[in-house]
């Protein structure tokens, strides 16, 4: 059966209706009656009594005193009484109330006429859109046939009859006081008007089947079928077969009730035929209909679902009470499918009504709907259509078919993106034709939608001077207005028709919506920047990019103009004229910048208002065009931005005032809300121009390419066939062959993606004006490979510096030759400080040998530097648990510094000859380091001063300092100037930042992301990112230098033999007692100048061993005439140590006092005699040997007076204490030992120890309990290995030393002392 193509035309304009709100003034209020007070009620009566009294008095006196004044006075009082009685009454008079009531009733009559006018307009519009069923037969073949599109309000709204419908205009009464105070007659009149006029009586009403998944119809079969026929007749008359399909399953399909459906093109099955033509969705069973509908229902989402592109809606009629409506799709409902099921089963009384699946009852010409309370009237007068009338309409429609080239869209009706641009198939673009050169007048001029008259709306981005609307524009639209849809339409039209050498785009969305990300792969798109609200660095980067592009274009115009014409070009137009004249210049494409949600950007970054103003002013000449888009317009924030815009686009806005600000009138506010009105707006092409109403094309939907036409060939002679509603089988000798049809197996793709992929594969990409931010980690290997740094130059890369203004990234390079060779890295917790040090060390090691660079590390930052301990370039890694290694590290570096200062360690070849090369002291976490090794008197680590010295003095001698700290304030002031290279990572508090930008409202530190370790700022406020090191590279680097490593840090031995320090007696009375930790030099005690020595330590700390070493060394290097010993050894530890003959050794306490008295008497004799002259005194010297008083464990000897014997009342140390101050001159040497525990108290109470401490005797503090609160000369004891201690001289500068162990050889030989005690293993005692 052949059909004619129905040519669609633009829909006739229906009668207009006025919407909005009709505000009604409230009725007048009755006056409130306030009861008078008692005084006001009584006062008139008192005045009357007074008047009567006066008159009586006048007559009682014979009226002799009557005068005109006296006669007038009673009348005045009478008038006053009357005024009080009447004037005090605040009641409104009846006449006034009547007058106000009459005025209000006249006002209501005017309102009633206005409301009736609204109702009449609404009725006319409804009658136009939903005429009587009898009128439908006149529609086929006219312009109104199939007039409804998805964008129309009445799309898929099917008339069901007549009913009272609400008035479109809302009636609102202004706020009033309590209704009790209203004038009753006026109030009743108002209530009557509202009750009557709020509805339009007996108006056409319909069912919006787009919002219904199922309609259950109950009633007599004939009556229900008549109603359903009326609904279907409405549907097929107004809706194109491409937008609406009809399907039926009825046992009596061939009866007159439904056989007429066979004539409708809406029931055709696509690409399928039977013996008489197209197959039909008409079956006798639900199962058969389900099978036939399966392809059409396969990919539909569940009901309800939002869809950008309208699906073909299906009306599925089941005229079978026994059928299951859910059996059609075996699901509760599908989008775009409405099942109309006629049944006889009444709903259960407890059944809850479903608004998406209504149950209707057709009876007595009415339609009722099942609600919670039972059946409620739905349609007062139901439409009904006989089978004959329906067949008549179907036959009239049967001759027509829809135009396959007429594509309908929810946005623009028949005008789509592809039709407006003349693209037959967006999946097979002719890019060469689309990007072909065009005249300047046609450039940047593209259709983006249609106007209210159906004409294409052209968006011309060119400058006004070139005939366009630009260069800059403003678009405002609230949420749901279609702002993103309009922006996408503009972008896609421009990008589809312009190559990258004519147009490039930057899309910036501050709010973070990802809708524009689909444009990211277009070749003309420089960048799609989203989520700037959460990543402030993106906003700063965007600003730098705009400033940089303005500067770049200005520089290009200057250089090209001077080369071509001797002076700079004033604009890109002159630049392009030079290209047209034959000069070889690169193209300069127009830059189109879309700033979406720019008001939110200005709220967070107010300084960007000046940026946009600057770019808008300068960009006009440089072809940088800006389109500002937002949901609202904050005049206070945007400053002069709106003054720099020429064209305006106003979509649906939130208030009339915003509409007036954008387009000059309130029309943008009155745009209707709803999905069907998205993308509607007004374009003002120039200031003061008349707004043009338009609707933008919808480009964000799935694109379905046009399919090849399917031909049906019948190879048989024509034979008459009976045309039935059901399937007609072909004749036996008839063969139906179908042509090959292309099957699209690819997944659905959006139109934008379909076009973007083709453009990306064809054309060159835009210049790289935007580099992605430093969000992704950078491997150190990649940085080393990409950096232009030669090995061995004492320069190595650390990461990358981001320079969006120059539109490039530079390598962050450390240069040891510059003044910035000392490095400070400061950042908050987990900011990547330790990883940065790893990158620093590994990068240097990758380019230098261990002889050229060495590292010595102090790991206070959590252990990451310890991972570098195996690197050949690392001499040592010390942790806070290794204080000795830390001290030795500084000792080695100080010794190296002194050596290089003495000999200027750089030879003629420019390298160091001491084997260390360039030395780096690396301290991770200076804050923790500075608070280590502290006490009450030393709140900072004493070693911090050595770091400061190295930072300030070591640079000239190849010694560098690299430190990290959580806070710049933790760096000592004296050290700061020596730290030339300062890198700042993310800080806990941006107020601690030392990076400043002049004139900036915000600190640059605020823009550093918190979740990206290694990201930071240079002192020039440039963002950088440290490279990510790989510890697996350590083995690779070590393999390059087999057998070569950095000099290790030498530690003090735990068992020091005398041979290691020979000679032990380098000068008279100078005894080498051990080795100093700082420089590993021998430590000697010069008893001639420092005759007093105190040794404190706990058991087995080395006290007695030191005494043994001193005795042995002095005895072996002296004669009995030179030296004598007095040894007091309470515990017999020194009994086996031989002395000179006649020397005193005692372990008996009773012998201590006589020995001390004899020694003191001997020493006293060495004083010069009285009567010597000054010259004799200057030449006076004592004669005799030097006497060494050695007391082991002096704290064990009681200092109490003797209670018996010849020395009653005398103390052992009294006479010796008086000689200590002159011990050096009198040849007395005093060496005492004592326990560390309690020693602080002992030096304050014991006479001998107190005097020695007062004289600043040389003090050796061996191992002791650190929890002991006592201190010796400001120093607390610590746990040391045996023989290790702290030596305090008269300068109070402590030296950590290791004592000589003279017992080592004896222990190895197994000697046994004279007292029978075995020296176990050569232990210190």
From Swiss-Prot:
Domain FtsK per the UniProt entry, residue ranges: 454-660, 808-994, 1080-1268
Residue stretches spanning the membrane: 42-62, 65-85
Coiled coil: none
Keyword annotations: ATP-binding, Cell inner membrane, Cell membrane, Membrane, Nucleotide-binding, Repeat, Transmembrane, Transmembrane helix, Transport
Keyword tRNA processing carried by entry: no
UniProt-listed NCBIfam families: T7SS_EccC_a, T7SS_EccC_b
Principal place of residence: membrane
One example GO MF annotation: DNA binding
SMART domains in the record: AAA (SM00382)
GO CC annotations on file: plasma membrane
Compartments it resides in: Cell inner membrane
Binding, ATP: 477-484, 827-834, 1097-1104
Source species, domain of life: Bacteria
Biological role stated in the UniProt entry: Part of the ESX-3 specialized secretion system, which is required for siderophore-mediated iron acquisition and for the secretion of EsxH and EsxG.
InterPro entries, A to Z: AAA+_ATPase, EccCa-like_Actinobacteria, EccCb-like_Actinobacteria, FtsK/SpoIIIE/SftA, FtsK_dom, P-loop_NTPase
Name by which UniProt lists this protein: ESX-3 secretion system protein EccC3
Assembly and interaction partners: Part of the ESX-3 / type VII secretion system (T7SS), which is composed of cytosolic and membrane components. The ESX-3 membrane complex is composed of EccB3, EccC3, EccD3 and EccE3.
Membrane-protein topology: Multi-pass membrane protein
